[in-house]
């Protein structure tokens, strides 16, 4: 039997907070392009699967450097809408990498985190720019967490095991008693499990529905999973 989960670490982006698309996509709107939610959801799913393939080596890089998930996402979006403008792409990538632009929060998130916090100690591990705590404060959920581990401050990004080790140390938590909740398989799931933790994906757009990996699509589903024999995929 697996040890009981005592600590839950959360990713932030696309797990608890979501991008302010209106602000980030202002350069597109100025040029008459307003991508709808369904297009963006579909592109996120496709980009995650391609990015995971590159990160895990199942898709070759074809000699080109990997510029990161959002570089891939916006390169593809601009290609699909017929806007060939590297400066716009770079502006979009810089904007979405600014943690201050991740301030869209689902209704009920704070209440759900408080409920989870009544049963588990909760913390954050985020690839960010050193300012994610400020954003969590602004969104009203920073006090839900015992510790916040920001890659911009600790010097390591997921999936590097050191960022997970530092977060575990900050919580005095054993990896086998800790669960990580994040949204990208190759970065969050493999990073956490590689550090000895258990993991489950927060798969809001449904990118991993047919991939056979542990996943939920909301904090409500996570609570149900946690109450069902220590979670469907977190064991």
Language model segments and positions:
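Asp-based, Mg2+/Mn2+-dependent phosphohydrolase catalytic module
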Residues: 1-12, 38, 84-89, 110, ...
């Amino acid at each position: 039997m697996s040890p009981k989960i005592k600590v839950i670490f959360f990713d932030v982006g696309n797990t608890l907070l979501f991008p302010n698309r209106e602000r980030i996509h202002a350069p597109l709107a100025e040029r008459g392009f307003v991508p709808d939610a369904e297009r963006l959801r579909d592109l996120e799913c496709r980009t995650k699967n391609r990015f995971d393939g590159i990160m895990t080596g199942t898709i070759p890089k074809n000699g080109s450097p990997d510029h990161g998930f959002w570089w891939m996402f916006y390169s593809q979006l601009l290609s699909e809408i017929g806007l060939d403008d590297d400066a716009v792409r770079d502006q979009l990538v810089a904007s979405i990498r600014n943690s201050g632009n991740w301030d869209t929060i689902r209704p009920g998130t704070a209440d759900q985190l408080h409920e989870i916090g009544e049963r588990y100690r909760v913390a954050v591990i985020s690839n960010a720019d050193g300012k994610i705590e400020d954003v969590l404060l602004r969104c009203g959920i920073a006090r839900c967490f015992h510790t916040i581990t920001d890659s911009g401050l600790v010097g390591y990004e997921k999936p590097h095991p050191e960022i997970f080790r530092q977060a575990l140390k900050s919580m005095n938590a054993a990896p086998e008693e800790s669960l990580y909740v994040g949204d990208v398989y190759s970065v969050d799931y493999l990073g956490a499990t590689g550090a000895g933790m258990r993991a489950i994906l927060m798969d809001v757009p449904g990118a991993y529905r047919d991939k056979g990996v542990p996943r939920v699509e909301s904090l409500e589903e996570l609570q149900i999973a946690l109450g069902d024999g220590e979670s469907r995929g977190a064991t």
